[in-house]
């Protein structure tokens, strides 16, 4: 089996002008320390690390310049400096060296995404777990609604006003949904609704079937019993509201380094946001806008409206280069971008092949 190609990374913004070698070296050291420990670093420590060496006084002057440029800040008076989100962005776009995927990581991804004897749902859930494990953050895998043609649809009564809809795809996948129906729907209406839809399946996808059935029902509603029509409409409306399946694993890792109540509240808000339908649609839009792996820092993605959170996302494409999902990692701003980007890229390529 051919392996996915090496990572492809597209920077989000051009490298800012006016950053000299000395400033770049100091910013790099500060961001790398932040990624590794989360702690600020001072001029004395930097003076010992930098080659060629600079005096602490010179380093303090450069740090002050970087702070005025909005790239650094001091968490409190006596501390060293930390990078701002703008500083992290500059580092990612112009200073970061992306590592190659190790053979160990490649073998781990290959084995964990082995599809033999497993469902697509299991594989996608496993993909989000492995992303979380390799990134020490939360792994995201979004699979949009399948475009497979339909084989069978069935409606089963569960109780007053509740019906189970069973959707069988030509690829063998089975999807179950519970819908609400008007009271008093008899079993005969459920059978008629199933027969009506099954007689029109042909080689249609769910989207194609939905368009055809709605057009026919608008033109010849009098031919259907009112309760039968309501069952059909409820089923179609349920699938309309579904943008896909989002797998999120490793949320607990986002809480590992949090001590402040304010940050804890932010992460809880993030958890709530991840469960919304809007998040799924936005993830697909972000993936659609990306040729390769894309990094969003803080509010850049437009999804969460909060600082201190970064997201790395890539589209999963099939052999025809059609987007069939989105793969990503979400975590604190001090993610290990150099390691995570090739992991996300390779996983996206593998998942794209599986979903394709």
From Swiss-Prot:
InterPro entries reported for this sequence: GAF-like_dom_sf (IPR029016), HrcA (IPR002571), HrcA_C (IPR021153), WH-like_DNA-bd_sf (IPR036388), WH_DNA-bd_sf (IPR036390), WHTH_transcript_rep_HrcA_IDD (IPR023120)
The UniProt record lists the keyword Transcription regulation: yes
UniProt cross-references to SUPFAM superfamilies, sorted A to Z: GAF domain-like, Winged helix' DNA-binding domain
Disulfide-bond pairs as recorded: none
Record carries keyword Glycosyltransferase: no
GO molecular function, one term: DNA binding
HAMAP family assigned to the protein according to its UniProt record, in alphabetical order: HrcA
Family, per entry: Belongs to the HrcA family.
Reported function: Negative regulator of class I heat shock genes (grpE-dnaK-dnaJ and groELS operons). Prevents heat-shock induction of these operons.
Protein name: Heat-inducible transcription repressor HrcA
Organism: Gluconobacter oxydans (strain 621H) (Gluconobacter suboxydans)
């Amino acid at each position: 089996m051919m392996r996915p190609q090496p990572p492809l990374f597209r920077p989000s913004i051009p490298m800012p002008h006016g950053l000299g070698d000395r400033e770049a070296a100091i910013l790099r050291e500060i961001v790398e320390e932040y990624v590794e420990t989360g702690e600020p670093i001072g001029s004395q420590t930097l003076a010992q690390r930098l080659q060629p060496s600079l005096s602490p006084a010179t380093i303090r002057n450069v740090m002050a310049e970087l702070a005025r440029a909005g790239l650094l800040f001091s968490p409190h008076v006596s501390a060293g400096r930390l990078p701002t989100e703008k500083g992290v962005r500059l580092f990612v776009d112009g200073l970061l060296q992306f590592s190659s995927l190790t053979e160990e990581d490649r073998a781990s991804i290959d084995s964990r995404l082995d599809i033999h004897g497993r469902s697509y749902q299991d594989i996608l859930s496993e993909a989000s777990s492995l992303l979380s494990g390799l990134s020490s953050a939360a792994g995201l895998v979004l699979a949009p609604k399948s475009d497979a043609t339909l084989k069978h649809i069935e409606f089963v009564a569960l109780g007053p006003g509740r019906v189970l809809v069973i959707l069988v795809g030509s690829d063998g996948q089975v999807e179950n949904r519970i819908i609400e129906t008007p009271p008093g729907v008899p079993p005969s209406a459920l059978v008629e609704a199933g027969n009506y839809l099954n007689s029109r399946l042909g080689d249609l996808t769910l989207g194609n079937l939905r368009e055809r059935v709605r057009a026919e029902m608008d033109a010849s509603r009098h031919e259907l019993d009112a309760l039968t029509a309501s069952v059909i409409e409820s089923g179609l409306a349920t699938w309309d509201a579904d943008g896909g399946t989002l797998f999120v694993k490793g949320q607990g890792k986002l809480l590992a380094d949090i001590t402040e109540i304010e940050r804890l509240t932010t992460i809880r808000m993030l958890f709530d946001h991840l469960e919304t339908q809007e998040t799924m649609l936005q993830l697909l839009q972000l993936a659609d806008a990306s040729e390769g792996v894309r990094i969003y820092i803080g509010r850049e993605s437009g999804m969460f409206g909060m600082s201190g959170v970064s997201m790395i996302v890539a589209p999963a494409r099939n052999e025809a280069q059609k987007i069939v999902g989105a793969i990503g990692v979400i975590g604190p701003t001090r993610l290990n971008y150099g390691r995570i980007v090739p992991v996300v890229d390779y996983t996206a390529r593998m998942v794209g092949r599986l979903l394709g």
